[in-house]
């Protein structure tokens, strides 16, 4: 794993040293277009995931279903360190909420901003309302916006509490929610594991796009988060089977038509 992460850091260095300056010049001449950096990131992510697969560490099957065609808020569970990379690779024109601490440590702040990503609040220079406004702006520009309701990786073999932020974002933006379910067995570097201790054997990852959902009505975001969390727990086998209280057509608008 040390060698692999060395390659990962080398890729970041080359992106900062070569790719970012080239795209900066192109953006100065032709005008800024986040899709250029997103396209570059998707290529680099694809190479990294191919390397993990080739080393017998992590592999993923073909996703089940398709994401909603237009602007939406994408929400998901987060069982492992790299599941988000599959989503970045497979879902085009998607902005992502990125931990500001991670962006500073690598350092990738200019790359993420160039790609149209939004940095998470640090409660010092950036508050949650500023991040919310930036996310709404991205959605109104035509992007899908990806965020994790747990706000961090899931506990090993479990699921964290869903917060209401993503569902408030969907309501304020007046766009559908696109829930997707990630099953990772065994979890590849979950929250409790050290990055230098990969799981024994191949970790397999499956992604399932659920039916899009209309956003909650005003004041119902917390209840919506609680109910959707229960649905994920049921899918993970963490609670007794029960009928979900969530329906694709419940909300404050017309039921969105899912992509086929």
Task: Enumerate the predicted regions with their spans.
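Catalytic core of membrane glycerolipid acyltransferases/transacylases, capturing the structured
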Residues: 23-40, 72-125
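Conserved H-X4-D acyltransferase segment
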Residues: 3-8, 44-98
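A transmembrane-helix-recognition feature enriched in membrane-embedded lipid enzymes
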Residues: 1-61, 110-111
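A short acidic, often aromatic-flanked loop/helix-cap motif at beta-alpha or helix-coil junctions
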Residues: 67-69, 103-104, 124-128, 213-219
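Short amphipathic alpha-helical segments and helix-helix/interface helices
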Residues: 49, 87, 109, 135-136, ...
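Alpha-helical membrane-embedding segments
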Residues: 64-81, 107, 130-133, 139, ...
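Non-catalytic C-terminal accessory region of glycerolipid acyltransferases
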Residues: 129-260
């Amino acid at each position: 794993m040390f060698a692999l992460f060395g390659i990962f850091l080398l890729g970041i260095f080359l992106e900062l040293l070569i790719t970012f300056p080239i795209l900066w010049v192109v953006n100065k001449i032709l005008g800024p277009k986040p899709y250029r950096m997103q396209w570059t990131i998707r290529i680099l992510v694809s190479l990294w995931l191919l390397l993990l697969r080739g080393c017998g560490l992590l592999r993923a099957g073909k996703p089940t279903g398709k994401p909603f065609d237009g602007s939406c808020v994408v929400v998901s569970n987060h069982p492992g360190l790299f599941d988000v990379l599959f989503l970045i690779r497979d879902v085009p024109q998607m902005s992502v909420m990125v931990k500001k601490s991670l962006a500073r440590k690598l350092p990738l702040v200019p790359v993420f901003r160039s790609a149209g990503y939004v940095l998470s609040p640090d409660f010092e220079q950036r508050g949650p309302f500023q991040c919310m406004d930036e996310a709404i702006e991205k959605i109104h520009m035509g992007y899908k916006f990806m965020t994790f309701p747990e706000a961090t990786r899931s506990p090993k073999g479990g699921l964290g509490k869903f917060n209401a932020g993503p569902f408030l974002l969907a309501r304020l933006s007046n766009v559908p929610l696109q829930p997707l379910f990630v099953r990772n067995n065994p979890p590849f570097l979950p929250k409790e594991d050290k990055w230098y201790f990969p799981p024994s054997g191949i970790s397999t990852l499956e992604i399932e796009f659920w039916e899009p959902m209309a956003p909650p009505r005003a004041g119902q975001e917390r209840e919506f988060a609680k109910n959707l969390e229960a649905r994920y727990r049921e899918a993970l086998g963490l609670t007794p089977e029960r009928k979900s209280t969530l329906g694709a057509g419940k909300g404050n608008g017309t039921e969105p038509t899912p992509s086929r």
